[in-house]
């Protein structure tokens, strides 16, 4: 079966994205394999987002605008609820795959054809995607561009699920504190699906991730809190913070990440994940740590340079 024989639909939650969404729409319109339907869910946008989308709905019958009521609270549960509302409009259709596409993403014209091909090649592939790049002048600079990258994780900005897998994980769980995409992908692995990021292609993320409401340093602090929130192992997350010391913001970014994790631990921040998922997550982290521990010894024995810990 070729990738072109598979069909897909897209849902895009969007809130005040007038600066980016037109480029996203143009990227999808230019695809060599277009979606069967695309529902763009405006989450109470108060800028020009809706009018931009309406212009394209008049040109392309497979694009639909769904407007949610206006509200002031910007949080991740709202994004999950928007996705669910958009997906409800699609469930009666016949399709194989469903994609979650952020409203500030662009990519090349064969992006989805490439991903559809991966699903055709791998019957157990449940979720896939590619790295995202935040600086278009450095397309090879992303969090998967090193030897220690976790290719089983799929970033939430542009995920695509096999329909059966999406049903198995229960869709995106509406959790106010975030990590809805991480929970979906990790649950998929726990239920026996393969999840994979393919680095042969990238997409471009035009708003720096994690900085919508925070400075870069506070974004790192909140990432640390989130690492605790989803049940990350203390040893792994502390080492992860030290590995991030070399990243921008230099030194402080990694320390803020560690501080966020341990602040959440000391204040006993509520964790929304099940004990089963937390245990699975920690077991995966410890398995990766053992593999990383063995790799330097094997590399030294073979006289091979060991990759840095950036982005672990």
Roles of regions detected by a PLM:
Residues 7-9, 37, 183:
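Cell-envelope/extracellular polymer assembly enzymes that use nucleotide-activated donors
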Residues 93, 106-145:
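Conserved donor NDP-sugar-binding/catalytic core segment of glycosyltransferases
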Residues 1-30:
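N-proximal low-complexity "stem/linker" segments adjacent to membrane-targeting elements
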Residues 219-312:
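Non-catalytic, C-terminal membrane-associated alpha-helical segments of glycosyltransferases
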Residues 165-169, 175-206:
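A short, conserved alpha-helix in the catalytic core of glycosyltransferases
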Residues 155-170:
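Conserved nucleotide-sugar donor-binding
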Residues 26-72:
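Acidic donor-binding segment of Leloir-type glycosyltransferases
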Residues 86, 94-106:
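Short beta-strand-to-loop acidic/aromatic patch adjacent to the donor-nucleotide binding site
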